[in-house]
């Protein structure tokens, strides 16, 4: 069972989200105009965006106004979200070019039918309607748009549009010269035909809508006030209330005035300047780069120029992807990656970590030199060298802890079964009384017997605390004296039992005699 108007409700909700910028995961920038949209909707109608989002994860897509104009993209975006033609007159030629650029094949048939039925003069450029749909426009763009409408004579004398530094860096010198000569030729034609200087001096790419000239009195006043400013590349006079100002989420680029490389960090730009000057880069203790006094003026001018944000000539998506993958943009966002002067030495960090780890590991094995953080870990490691201190008298199985020996049950266990405790090992490993729960587990029916004097005790702590005063203690003292003799170097006593030590000592004596 199909629900009525389900698709219409979905389109209305998506369009409302787009106009308010809610849940929009993509921003399309065309010059100074920014469109909020959803990637899924754009990819559904445009193969261009579909392939772009496959290979690019950026949330901002920058397009050139020469590829598709903002009014055309707004018209197509409204058609994608609503399925209806906007109440807006659009040039069919530019509309067809925009559809071909976006590869929006599902919209070709609808746009062609609308253009054939609604437009009888395809060569005429119609004005924009009262609104563009879901866009953002910079504040200076609106101010310059009102001034260009009232200063046609100023525009005729200086027809060069204001372009961003990114587009100027990518265009070769030959293309810039050819564009300059074409603009000069257009200026000459406007001087010869003064009837309509605004429409004939600029190409349709620079001015999308003709604006009627103001009265002569107002023209002179506005011309004097805007003598130091250049005209904008797009004239958009009406926006919707949902349009917001440009925020600081878009990255700023710091461009080198010598080679054109761009950086997102000013410190990276300062380091790059040393390549051109040949002066080695040095950093102070505060982590800030020091530049020679001869470069202060250039660096100051460069910093002012670099603060300008790309405006009219935005790069396309393919060029943006190429720039993001290439090493041209060396710096990253300051919140993600600090400048090189703020990054500490890796060797010093590793050395500090090692010293900190040594302070933490204060329990050291006297035999192999390993260090441990907890005393219990060190004690269990010592049992590797000395042997486990608790042993079952029936099955001769050894245990590290007393509670393990207490829980142990043998198949051949009898009433006479006991746990043999190695007193030497416990004294060497500084056996300590455990928690109350461990003591409850240790107190079992099996007694604990000392391996030196064969005395029986109820807990292993009593075995450690008692003193052996019989023959076995004397034997233990003799064994300790023998170990001391092994270390002192008496070769006559230790030679039959330790031939390896005797041979080493003989070699040392021969070396001393030679």
UniProtKB/Swiss-Prot annotation:
Cite the entry's keywords alphabetically: DNA-binding, Isopeptide bond, Metal-binding, Nucleus, Phosphoprotein, Repeat, Transcription, Transcription regulation, Ubl conjugation, Zinc, Zinc-finger
Per the record, the major location class is: nucleus
Q: Which residues carry this modification: Phosphoserine?
A: 341
In terms of superkingdom, the source organism counts as Eukaryota
**Covalent link Glycyl lysine isopeptide (Lys-Gly) (interchain with G-Cter in SUMO2), residues:** 147, 154, 362, 465, 505-506
- Which CDD domains did the record assign? BTB_POZ_ZBTB2 (cd18193)
Q: Does the keyword Endoplasmic reticulum apply?
A: no
Q: Where are the zinc fingers (C2H2-type)?
A: 254-276, 363-385, 390-410, 448-468
Q: What does this protein do?
A: May be involved in transcriptional regulation.
Protein name, per record: Zinc finger and BTB domain-containing protein 2
